[in-house]
Design a protein with these regions (language model features):
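Terminal substrate-recognition subdomain of acyl/acetyltransferases
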Residues: 122-123, 132-146
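A conserved beta-turn-beta hairpin within the catalytic core of GNAT-like acetyltransferases
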Residues: 63-72, 81, 127-131
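Conserved acetyl-CoA-binding loop-helix of GNAT-fold acetyltransferases
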Residues: 76, 82-95, 122
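Conserved GNAT acetyl-CoA-binding A-motif
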Residues: 97-109
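Conserved beta-strand-loop-alpha-helix junction that forms the acyl-donor binding cleft
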Residues: 107-116, 135-138
Length: 146
């Protein structure tokens, strides 16, 4: 298994993996090929895939705004879970973010995503009960939660 930086040419395989992963929150704009191209252009060194025999089996989308890091859309293929791949992807993203001067990283997980929440707790991410996450769409977004 190899961890490498994600490229736009990985998009179709990565998107298929996201669709096959329960608990993902996708939408038609941000997660389109154009949306991911924009994200990778802004964050060229912080997004990674895990590959085995030329097949993408894991992905982590992470980036920052110069002050805080954020992790989006982390997934490992069902048959490859519980083998340390997710942790290796997180380590790669965290190391890259740290190298870019980022000192704190946040993420959002659906409350009902028990598997995802257990994974992130194991990775050392704490729940912030004193915060309420809010969002507002400023474009016509179609949600596609898995």
């Amino acid at each position: 298994m190899t961890i490498r930086q994600m490229r736009l040419s990985d998009y179709d395989d990565v998107y298929s993996l996201w669709l096959a992963t329960p608990g993902m929150g996708l939408n038609n704009l941000d997660d389109s090929r154009d949306g991911i191209a924009k994200y990778l252009e802004r964050n060229p060194d912080t997004c990674f895939v895990a590959e085995e025999d030329g097949i993408i089996i894991g992905v982590i989308l992470s980036g920052h705004d110069g002050r805080r890091g954020f992790i989006h859309h982390t997934a490992v293929a069902r048959d490859n879970q519980r083998q340390g791949i997710g942790g290796a992807l997180v380590d790669a993203a965290m190391s890259s973010l740290k190298n870019e001067g980022i000192n704190k990283v946040a993420l959002v997980v659906f409350e009902q995503n028990e598997k995802g929440n257990a994974f992130w707790e194991k990775q050392g991410f704490a729940i912030r009960p004193n915060l309420i996450y809010r969002a507002k769409a400023i474009a016509d977004i179609i949600r596609m939660d898995t």
